[in-house]
Regions:
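GST superfamily/GST-like fold recognition
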Residues: 65-86
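GST-like domain detector, emphasizing the conserved glutathione-binding G-site
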Residues: 1-40
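Surface-exposed helix-capping loop/turn segments at secondary-structure junctions
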Residues: 58-66, 108-113
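Short helix-capping/linker segments at secondary-structure and domain boundaries
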Residues: 21, 31-34, 81-91
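Structural motif
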Residues: 2-6, 62-69
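C-terminal end-helix/capping segment
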Residues: 92-115
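Non-globular targeting/processing and membrane-anchoring segments
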Residues: 21-22, 52, 78, 113-122
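Amphipathic alpha-helical packing segments from all-alpha helical-bundle domains
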Residues: 40-58
């Protein structure tokens, strides 16, 4: 990782981790509370998702040949939202992220590790 981009990469890593943390909290709550989203904790987690996506929309750069760890983490977090919280319309919050994700998610490494894709034997 280039030293001049360490802070940028760590910022994206932190934001991606925050999205995943909030999303997992909502998923677990729904599984054990019959999908009741009226709990204030769930509302706080939902608000954190909205804020995180809005911030990331202004942070991501065009995809390059070798994306950094932060970009990969953001892509995984957004795909996790699609997979586990399909009712959360993060694309309605972000203007740049949907097209950015379309490009980075087409990388062979991300395509090969999507849920439901058969993994090659080792």
């Amino acid at each position: 990782m280039p030293l001049d981009r360490v802070e940028e990469v760590h910022r994206k890593l932190g934001l991606a981790q925050g999205l995943i943390d909030s999303a997992v909290g909502i998923v677990v709550h729904r599984r054990f509370r019959d999908g009741d989203d009226s709990d204030p904790v769930i509302q706080r987690r939902h608000d954190a998702l909205v804020r995180g996506v809005a911030v990331l929309d202004g942070v991501v750069r065009p995809v390059v040949d070798r994306p950094d760890m932060g970009s990969l983490a953001v892509a995984v977090a957004l795909e996790f939202l699609d997979f586990r919280l399909p009712d959360f319309d993060w694309r309605g919050i972000a203007s740049e992220l949907p097209s950015w994700l379309g490009v980075i998610a087409s990388r062979p490494s991300l395509v090969a590790t999507q849920p439901g894709i058969e993994q090659p034997p080792f």
